[in-house]
């Protein structure tokens, strides 16, 4: 069993709404005043399309973790010269594995006409930390060159 050279296409609904109408897709441009929200992180039924070169694609029902989680940056309550950061992502909590057989009509020998591939799906979904952020990897806007472009440019006092 192998997932080598196997491609996985996920067909899923993105659980977001614009003015109470469901929308799908990854990118939405919104006019000012538009109400936009996405559902919390949850396990969602999807269709996985398993593909392997020389084999017929096979659509299988599965699950994916889809939804929003809270992330923020704010001034520290105890040390106002520091920022507190938290980044949470909708991720799996445990996984299940399944073996699927793909039909490969162009295979040279009879043995390889049916290829076993492994696929995985989440058992549960939850908001979990995305990963740690090293303080040294965060570049202040002034260093990155964005400070004069932002809406807060004149809000903060410049230090000499």
UniProtKB/Swiss-Prot annotation:
Recorded GO MF terms: BMP binding; hormone activity
Keywords of the record: Disulfide bond, Hormone, Secreted, Signal
Disulfide bonds: 41-90, 55-104, 65-125, 69-127, 87-130
Alphabetized PROSITE patterns for the sequence: CTCK_2
Domain CTCK residues, every copy: 38-131
InterPro entries: Cys_knot_C (IPR006207), Cystine-knot_cytokine (IPR029034), DAN (IPR004133)
Regions crossing the membrane: none
One cellular component (GO) term of this entry: extracellular space
Compartment(s) where it occurs, according to its Swiss-Prot or TrEMBL record: Secreted
Origin superkingdom: Eukaryota
PANTHER family per record: BURSICON, GREMLIN 1
Record's function text: Final heterodimeric neurohormone released at the end of the molting cycle, involved in the sclerotization (tanning) of the insect cuticle, melanization and wing spreading.
Subunit structure: Heterodimer of burs and pburs.
Protein name (record): Bursicon
């Amino acid at each position: 069993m192998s997932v080598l050279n196997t491609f996985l296409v996920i067909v899923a609904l993105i659980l977001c709404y614009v003015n109470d109408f469901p929308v799908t897709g990854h990118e939405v441009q919104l006019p000012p005043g538009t109400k936009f929200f996405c559902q919390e992180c949850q396990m969602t039924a999807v269709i996985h399309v398993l593909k392997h070169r020389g084999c017929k694609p096979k659509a299988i029902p599965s699950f994916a973790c889809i939804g929003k989680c809270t992330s923020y940056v704010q001034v520290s309550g105890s040390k106002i010269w520091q920022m507190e950061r938290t980044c949470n992502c909708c991720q799996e909590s445990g996984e299940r594995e399944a073996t699927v057989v793909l039909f490969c009509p162009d295979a040279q020998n009879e043995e390889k006409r049916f290829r076993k591939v492994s696929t995985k799906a989440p058992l549960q979904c939850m908001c979990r930390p995305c990963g740690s952020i090293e303080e040294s990897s965060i570049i202040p806007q002034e260093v990155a060159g964005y400070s004069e472009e932002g809406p807060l440019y004149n809000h903060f006092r410049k230090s000499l």
